[in-house]
From Swiss-Prot:
It comes from the Bacteria. The keyword Electron transport applies. The lineage of its organism: Bacteria, Pseudomonadati, Pseudomonadota, Betaproteobacteria, Nitrosomonadales. NCBIfam families: napH, PRK09477.1. Pfam families: Fer4_10, Fer4_5. This is Methylamine utilization ferredoxin-type protein MauN.
Amino acid sequence: MTNMGAIRAALYRRRWLLSRRVVQMFIVLAFLVDWPEVGRIAHGNLSSSLWLGVLPLTDPFIALQSLFSGTMLAKTALVGTVIVAGFYFLFGGRIYCSWVCPINMVTDLAYWLRQKLNLKGNMTMSRELRMAVLGMSLILTVLSGTLAWENFNPITLFQRELMWTSVAGSMVLLSLFLFDLLITRRGWCGHLCPVGAFYAVLGRYGRLRVTAEQSGSCAGCGSCIRVCPEPHVLAPVVSLKANTVTHGDCTRCGACLDQCATGALAMKLDLGKSFRGIPIVRK
């Protein structure tokens, strides 16, 4: 294989990861850079923004907190909420976590370094803990009459750090990085983040799904599960109990597709009848 062929092969094996990074960096830069002939593409932040001066986008979790705090949404914010909620409801809520959220780049870096350093420490934590954090954040919102979670939200602090060099933002990002690196694998996104918990519920029946229609080519190596940030979502597919990942925790990150050397997995948009996984047998 030529050097160029080797490069192409290496890029193809990371096609989903590279695609996500391009999208994430574009979104970050859209809020920061004045583009030629266009100017600033997005004004605001990931909580509520206006794109190209015409398209309002509002985080549904922010909208929910606003309602719980007793604040009525402005018409533009309501329209933005419907647009964003509709998108994630159709395609899968946790697409936000792997394709939009900038914190994902921080936690992915921690995971990569953890693997390179062969760090074994992994504190046991229930994945349901993030649902408890979600519930607590809404309770605090009701009691305080404010968007309580936004005082601690790493996503908000990340954008403040980029725009105004916030010391608090730097400390939170460093803490999350060290937590994921030293304490537990995928600790923040996989066990604690209430935003991810909210989007998992919102996009439970999203139609963009990982499928194993070529299950006969599966080598049974388990490499897809090892790289998956939410490995429990792949268990029914790998054990051949279903040919489609239907769990709301799936982030559609494509890590399993990048890792699968046999092409047994694919990402497909299913617009047919709702299903929870069609039983299959090994060929």
